[in-house]
Amino acid sequence: MKQTKKSRLAKWAAAGFWLAVWQAAAMAVGQEVFLVSPVQALSTLLELLPQAEFWQRIGFSAGRILLGFGLGAVSSVVLAVAAGRWAWVEALLAPVMQLVKATPVASFIILALVWVSGSSLSVLISFLMVLPVLYGAVRTGIGSADVQLLEMAKVFRLPLGRRLRAIWLPAVLPAFRQGCSVALGICWKSGVAAEVIGLPDSSIGDALYRAKITLSTGELFAWTFVIILLSAVFEKLFLALLDRAVAHVLGEEGV
């Protein structure tokens, strides 16, 4: 308990330190067009909160980015299971996954604009960024399954459902959870970056671009804070729901 309290105090102290550095830097620069103070950024955010357009932009971007994440998560699990079952599938997918991981996000965004509209761009980019991360995580989990337990399950001819609960899910889910934690952050960053280039109306990326061209640095910082907050909140909510689902599936609920 004391350790947890000390850890929280340390985090708050670190946050306070960097806010003080930010405030000092803003005062040293002395021009809000280049760097606003944290107080001014917060003030701008509070001005945005009552506006219907603010929430409309959040709903638009969040819906598409999370759709891309969901599609990427489902596809990665299906492909990873297929790769674990058939070696030729893994051989086919290996160069594709490596290519997706190595290609800059900006290149994908520009190329994707040829194929899809600006409003769908963030879905596709989020999907592409999530896919190799979760594919690798699930493959790692599958590879860590206990070989002896698998042999025993084969000998005793355990049904698929029992094998999933007793062997495969305990091996895969920790790696999948860790992969989701990484992938959620990536999909938010890449999704908003896609919106900044694709400029779909009523999106967060469009708001960032407008703030940049009008030199509204306060809005730029306010929207950046919103993106960080949304990413953190959705990550915590998703991981909490995933943990509850895992506990239920593995029969650990209430333990």
Write out the residue ranges for each language-model feature:
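Transmembrane alpha-helices
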Residues: 124-128, 160-194, 222
